[in-house]
């Protein structure tokens, strides 16, 4: 029987790498918890900045945080005022030196997490789930994806009974390890309850990182 697994975790060290780049002999749980708090804080503070991922690397005396965003201007603010405020809050929160870098995402339409968040935001604005899914799929394929699969689960359209709706275009080979598949998940908080949005984007085959 086939089992569902996270496509990103399944391909770690084959074509993907970790978002936390550090090693610890001691205090592993403390540092892991710090990473979790950092990501949660940055995502919450810049919810509308379309953040695809936050990569954290630790050195002896500084923590390097790379924020990948489709709207870097929203994070930086006028003359870098907003980013300085965020740095100060993070330093207070984890009591360590921070080096914060904002990296622009060139093609946000191909990032599964950004597609999922975009669909979730549309559902919260009461846009039809079918229209939101179809529009996102078309935009993704137009930019150059080989295939995309989207699922919405919950009380869709305010229905009494929860169900799952799927929309798929092109090829999404989940069983092929060398297939570069991006995965994203988001939740839409509607008046009828939470709707879960999952997105798989197939970007083509890639050589493994070991080759």
UniProtKB/Swiss-Prot annotation:
GO terms for cellular component: cytosolic small ribosomal subunit. Gene3D superfamilies: 3.30.300.20, Ribosomal protein S3, C-terminal domain. The keyword rRNA-binding applies. Residues 38-106 form the KH type-2 domain. PANTHER family: 30S/40S RIBOSOMAL PROTEIN S3, SMALL RIBOSOMAL SUBUNIT PROTEIN US3C. Belongs to the universal ribosomal protein uS3 family. Binds the lower part of the 30S subunit head. Binds mRNA in the 70S ribosome, positioning it for translation. This is Small ribosomal subunit protein uS3. The gene is rpsC.
């Amino acid at each position: 029987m086939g089992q569902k697994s996270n496509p990103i975790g399944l391909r770690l060290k084959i074509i993907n790498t970790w978002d936390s780049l550090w090693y610890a002999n001691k205090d592993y749980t403390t540092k892991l918890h710090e990473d979790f708090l950092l990501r949660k804080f940055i995502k919450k503070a810049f919810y509308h900045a379309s953040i695809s991922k936050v990569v954290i690397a630790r050195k002896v005396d500084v923590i390097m945080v790379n924020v990948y965003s489709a709207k870097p201007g929203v994070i930086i603010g006028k003359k870098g005022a907003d980013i300085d405020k965020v740095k100060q809050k993070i330093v207070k929160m984890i009591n360590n030196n921070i080096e914060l870098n904002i990296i622009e995402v060139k093609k946000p339409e191909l990032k599964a997490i950004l597609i999922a968040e975009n669909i979730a935001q549309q559902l919260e604005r009461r846009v039809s789930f079918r229209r939101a899914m179809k529009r996102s799929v078309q935009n993704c394929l137009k930019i150059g994806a080989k295939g995309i699969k989207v699922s919405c689960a919950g009380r869709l359209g305010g229905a009494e009974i929860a169900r799952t709706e799927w929309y798929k275009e092109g090829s999404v080979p989940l069983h092929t390890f060398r297939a570069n598949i991006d995965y994203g998940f988001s939740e839409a908080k509607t008046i009828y309850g939470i709707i879960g949005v999952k997105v798989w984007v197939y970007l083509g085959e890639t050589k493994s990182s070991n080759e």
